[in-house]
Regions:
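Basic- and aromatic-enriched surface patches that contact anionic nucleotides/nucleic acids
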Residues: 1-12, 26-36, 40-163
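A short, surface-exposed helix-loop junction/capping segment
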Residues: 19-26
C-alpha cells in the first residue's frame, strides 16, 4: 500500500465532496454519528487555527477517493459550510474573538472569516495500490481507543482546574 500526503484547503475538499470526487459514505463506512456539539468543537478548532487529524482516503479504480478515516470531520465541515450548524462561541478555553461569533452560521460570517475557514488546510493521506486487507487494518489501528489515565486527564488542563 502506498500513502501519499497532501495539504488540501477546505474549499477544495467541499468542492470535491459536492462533485462526487470524495465519497463520504462508501459501503464500509458507518453513518454520521457525531453530535452537534462535537461538530461545533471541530469548527471551533478550525477557526482557532488549530491542527486537526489527517483525513485518510482510498483512491479507488473509478478515480474516486473513498473516506477511510475522517468521515465525521468532513461531514461536520460540510454541515457548517452548508449552514446546517452554527458556531458555539462558548467552547472552552474562552476566546474573546470567537465568542463574538456565537450563534453565527457560515453565511453570517464576515468575508474575512469565511476566507479563513475556506483556506484552512487539512492533511489528506491518499492510499493507493492497497491489498484487500490493508485498508481495514489501517482503519482499525487509527481508531483503537486509548483512554487517558486520571493523572493524564488532570495534566491536560491548565489553571485552577489543574491545581
Amino acid at each position: 500500500m502506498k500513502c501519499e500526503s497532501t495539504d488540501l484547503e477546505i474549499e477544495t475538499l467541499i468542492s470535491r465532496i459536492k462533485n462526487g470526487d470524495i465519497d463520504l459514505q462508501p459501503d464500509f463506512q458507518r453513518g454520521e454519528i457525531w453530535t452537534v456539539q462535537k461538530k461545533q468543537k471541530l469548527i471551533d478548532s478550525i477557526l482557532r487555527g488549530w491542527k486537526i487529524p489527517p483525513i485518510h482516503v482510498i483512491h479507488n479504480s473509478h478515480a474516486i477517493d473513498e473516506v477511510l478515516d475522517g468521515q465525521q470531520r468532513l461531514a461536520a465541515i460540510r454541515d457548517f459550510f452548508d449552514n446546517i450548524i452554527c458556531i458555539d462561541g462558548d467552547i472552552q478555553p474562552e476566546d474573546s474573538i470567537i465568542s463574538t461569533l456565537n450563534g453565527l452560521h457560515y453565511r453570517d460570517l464576515s468575508k474575512e472569516w469565511q476566507r479563513r475557514f475556506r483556506q484552512y488546510s487539512i492533511v489528506v493521506i491518499r492510499l493507493t495500490e492497497c491489498r484487500p486487507e490493508e485498508p481495514a487494518e489501517l482503519f482499525y489501528r487509527l481508531n483503537q481507543p486509548m483512554a487517558l489515565t486520571s493523572a493524564e486527564q488532570r495534566n491536560a488542563y491548565i489553571g485552577v482546574t489543574r491545581e
